[in-house]
Curated annotation (Swiss-Prot):
One of its GO terms (cellular component) is cytosol. Catalyzes the ATP-dependent transfer of a sulfur to tRNA to produce 4-thiouridine in position 8 of tRNAs, which functions as a near-UV photosensor. Also catalyzes the transfer of sulfur to the sulfur carrier protein ThiS, forming ThiS-thiocarboxylate. This is a step in the synthesis of thiazole, in the thiamine biosynthesis pathway. The sulfur is donated as persulfide by IscS. NCBIfam families: tRNA uracil 4-sulfurtransferase ThiI. Its EC number is 2.8.1.4. The keyword Cytoplasm applies. CDD domains: PPase_ThiI (cd01712), THUMP_ThiI (cd11716). This is Probable tRNA sulfurtransferase. One of its GO terms (molecular function) is tRNA-uracil-4 sulfurtransferase activity. It comes from the Bacteria. It comes from Bacillus subtilis (strain 168). ATP binds at M183, L184, H208, F209, R265, G287, Q296. Keywords: ATP-binding, Cytoplasm, Nucleotide-binding, RNA-binding, Thiamine biosynthesis, Transferase, tRNA-binding. The keyword Chaperone does not apply. InterPro entries: Rossmann-like_a/b/a_fold, ThiI_AANH, ThiI_fer, ThiI_N, THUMP_dom, THUMP_ThiI, tRNA_STrfase, tRNA_sulfurtransferase_ThiI.
Length: 401
């Protein structure tokens, strides 16, 4: 059967009222970006659907890309025919015969966007179902759990028939909800937090704190690899590498040992906030999960948050470690996160960090130290790079020759 289109169904975009048009346009841009290596494709979108005309491109090659685009509820290979009853019946029968084997069940589900069509939805289901039953053997109807779900979408300009649905990533198109900075370490949590933030439509830029010689170049490469993993869901990932050695050394010298972790997090948050402001972001994302470690108690979060009024988003706040690790496997960051290269937070962890720090105490300790020059020096010497998934990176390298 010659499937010549892909039909894309939107998720939450359909509920966005007056903003629907901008959401759909953003989704179209994101789809074009991940499918940019397929120049023959043509795109058409309406209120709650998008259609891609293949023009000879291999549809199976497109599926892995489409599954990673947030904002897509599901998508299907589709056959296009004229919106005439006889044409629809003939196309439906041909599609079923191409798929079924004796003993299979099927269901017809019609969506009639073209209200002037001669039959209503129920009449159409009965007409097409009866036509298929009369012209096949060993095929029966099952409206609850069919082996072959035949969907028919009747529009004025054409009708589309689909048989197999592929599940999309759901959520909202990346970039439709604004920009935020992700505090990206080398562990399991922050990449998963970044994934969930992108799923809610945020354009994410990553911030990593690097403290050589205490942390190695391999630890830095690990974070770059994690950013590449996340870039699959947004087309690319901007990563800001913050030189943090001098600041951490000062903290170790000037702040009481059991409060060094709290001070470190507060300084990190202030630097991330400066980057956010320069990059026109509106929030900061962390991988914190309530009570998971000493710095993630409610008292710690309160003391750390006090340095900024910027919204701090914590997508993992109610998840446990097992759930987070399972999600990291699902999104492809697990194998990188498990590599044994420590980041600056683990290198300088005190033996007995304060689990319930007092905001007044850490402010008192910090009042004896002028951190501002160190913050500004770190911001002035940030290394910024744009990273792509391995396939996109290979394509860009090939373009140089």
């Amino acid at each position: 059967m010659n499937y010549d289109h892909i039909l894309i169904r939107f998720g939450e975009i359909s509920t966005k009222g007056k903003n629907r048009k901008s959401f759909i346009e953003r989704l179209k841009q994101n789809i074009r970006l991940v499918l940019k290596d397929y120049p023959n494709l043509k795109y058409f979108s309406n209120r709650d659907r998008m259609t891609i005309t293949l023009n000879g491109e291999d549809p199976e090659a497109l599926f892995p890309h489409l599954k990673q685009v947030f904002g897509i509820q599901s998508f299907s290979l589709a056959i296009k025919c004229d919106s005439r009853l006889d044409d629809i019946k003939a196309t439906a029968l041909k599609a079923i015969k191409d798929q079924y084997k004796p003993g299979d069940t099927f269901k017809v589900a019609t969506k009639r966007a073209y209200k002037q069509f001669e039959l209503d939805t129920n009449q159409m289901n009965a007409e097409i179902g009866g036509h298929i039953l009369r012209n096949t053997e060993g095929l029966t109807v099952d409206v609850r759990n069919p082996d072959i779900p035949l969907r028919i979408e009747i529009r004025e300009e054409a009708t589309f028939l689909t048989i197999r649905d592929e599940k999309g990533a759901g959520g909202l198109p990346v970039g439709s909800a604004g920009k935020a900075m992700l505090m990206l370490s080398g562990g399991f949590d922050s990449p998963v937090a970044g994934f969930y933030a992108m799923k809610r439509g945020l354009s994410v830029e990553a911030v990593h704190f690097f403290s050589p010689p205490y942390t190695s170049e391999r630890a830095k490469q690990k974070v770059m690899d994690l950013a590449k993993c996340l870039s699959r869901f947004g087309g690319s990932m901007t990563l800001h590498i913050v030189p943090f050695t001098k600041t951490q050394e000062l903290i170790q010298k000037q702040i009481p040992e059991n409060y060094t972790m709290t001070a470190t997090r507060r300084l990190m948050l202030q630097i991330a906030d400066r980057i956010r402001e320069k990059r026109n972001g509106l929030a900061i994302i962390t991988g914190e999960s309530l009570g998971q470690v000493a710095s993630q108690t409610l008292e710690s979060m309160y003391a750390i948050n006090a340095v900024t009024s910027t919204p701090i988003l914590r997508p993992l706040i109610a998840m446990d470690k097992t759930e987070i690790i399972e999600k990291s496997r699902e999104i492809g960051t697990y194998e990188t996160s498990i590599q044994p290269f420590e980041d600056c937070c683990t290198i300088f962890t005190p033996p007995s960090p304060k689990t319930r720090p007092k905001k007044e105490k850490i402010e008192h300790f910090e009042s004896f130290v002028d951190f501002e020059p160190y913050i500004q020096e770190a911001v002035d010497n940030i290394e910024t790079m744009t990273l792509y998934s391995e396939q996109e990176a290979n394509d860009k390298f090939a373009e140089l020759f």
